[in-house]
């Protein structure tokens, strides 16, 4: 039998949160590339013949590990924070994360002088927590897992006066990370 997971509670709209199902277009991704240009260089795309031979197909690797936080998510964090209205930048941001998303928001917040609060669950990767903290984020331990940390953020963001940054439903975040696909198409257009 097939089991279908149901969300624990319905999704509600939070302060400053974009409407669900926002569509991100190629125009949005091109705008994100312009926004990111002063802060990030394109990453290399390499073909590894031995890896291709081992897998029996042509394989190309996009080296997002060369980004400042070692992950592609920094693209989304920078584009999102760069495009926040001034009042939201002054207020600061809050999000939940177990790692790369939090690092992305912490890095971008430091870049633009914005306060960042990151809720992490108990037991989250200590190296990721240390990185977020070193990037200037305020770390708050909440819950046993990501969902509990996220639920805490959703409940507290408005009362704290912070702009909630959803880890996925953010058009600027999505457009920012989409820039790596543009680079792939330009670097290996076939």
Q: For each predicted feature, which ranges?
A:
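Short amphipathic, helix-prone segments within low-complexity/disordered or flexible regions
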Residues: 2-5
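PLP-dependent amino-acid enzyme catalytic core
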Residues: 16-190
């Amino acid at each position: 039998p097939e089991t279908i997971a149901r969300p624990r509670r319905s999704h509600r709209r939070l302060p400053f949160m974009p409407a669900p199902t926002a569509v991100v277009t190629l125009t949005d991704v091109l705008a994100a590339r312009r926004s990111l240009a002063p802060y990030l260089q394109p990453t290399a795309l390499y073909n590894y013949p031995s890896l291709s031979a081992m897998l029996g197909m042509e394989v190309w690797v996009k080296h997002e590990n060369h980004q400042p936080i070692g992950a592609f998510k920094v693209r989304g964090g920078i584009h999102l924070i760069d495009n926040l209205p001034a009042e939201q930048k002054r207020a600061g941001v809050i999000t939940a994360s177990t790692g790369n998303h939090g690092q992305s928001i912490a890095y971008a917040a430091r870049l633009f002088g914005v306060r960042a609060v990151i809720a992490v669950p108990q037991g989250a990767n200590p190296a990721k927590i240390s990185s977020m903290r070193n990037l200037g984020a305020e770390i708050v331990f909440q819950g046993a897992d990501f969902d509990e940390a996220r639920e805490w953020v959703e409940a507290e963001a408005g009362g704290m006066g912070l702009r909630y940054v959803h880890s996925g439903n953010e058009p600027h975040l999505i457009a920012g990370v989409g820039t790596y696909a543009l680079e792939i198409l330009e670097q290996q257009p076939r």
